[in-house]
A protein has these predicted regions:
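Bacterial N-terminal signal peptides
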Residues: 5-15
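Extracytoplasmic copper-binding redox domains, predominantly the cupredoxin/blue-copper superfamily
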Residues: 19-203
Length: 203
């Protein structure tokens, strides 16, 4: 009986490890201050929570200086291991399930784009040096204004504090090979995802 119990325990442990290896969480982060963001942009833009307290004017100032706001990011986003910042890549194997968690106070999108570009908010595009919207993010209306593309498996919008299933690696939404992803609201939020075949080795 003791060995049976041990065997069951080992099987459960192996099952847990297998589960952990095939579920990857992509975290969206920001540090918006609810009072100042909601006063300028509109009610509900930033939801209160333990995500930070960057004032809207400071947020804009950082974008004017650096063309990014560092607290607004995907995790993983940046890799400084070689002494300079570069986009970190997320390695997955075909069949992996992704989960998208919004740990910030604003809504963010997780959108696959052919080429990194601007989003559907012209003001933020201009501040960050992204004058040309990624077509997967934005539609241009006859008057020149931008509206978001419809939500899809490769263009997911996640509200503040929410967690949603993301695309499955190897699916049409997240195909094998290299793909580029960005937030269509905050277009400096970017990441590269590489999906490998199940038995392919990678660095």
């Amino acid at each position: 009986m003791r060995w049976l119990a041990v065997g069951i325990g080992v099987a459960m442990l192996l099952g847990f490890v297998a589960y952990a290896q095939t579920n990857k969480t992509i975290t969206m982060r920001d540090a918006c201050d609810p009072d100042s963001f909601n006063a300028v942009v509109g009610p509900g833009t930033c939801v209160a929570g333990p995500h930070g307290n960057t004032l809207f004017n400071d947020f804009v100032g950082e974008l004017q200086t650096d063309q990014i706001a560092g607290a607004w990011r995907f995790n993983p986003m940046l890799d400084a291991s070689e002494g300079h910042f570069r986009l970190a890549r997320l390695d997955l194997k075909s069949g992996d399930q992704t989960t998208i968690q919004n740990a910030g106070g604003e809504t963010h999108s997780f959108t696959r784009v052919r080429k990194f570009g601007g989003g559907f908010i012209s003001f933020l595009n201009d501040l960050t040096g992204n004058p040309d919207p990624a077509p997967e993010c934005a539609q241009a209306l006859p008057d020149g204004s931008l509206v978001p593309q419809p939500e899809s498996d490769s263009n997911q919008f996640v509200e503040a504090g929410k967690t949603e299933p993301g695309p499955v690696a190897g699916s049409s939404a997240l195909p094998e090979g290299v793909s580029r992803w960005e937030c269509c609201i905050h277009p400096w939020m970017r990441m590269v995802v590489v999906v490998h075949e199940k038995h392919e080795k990678h660095d």
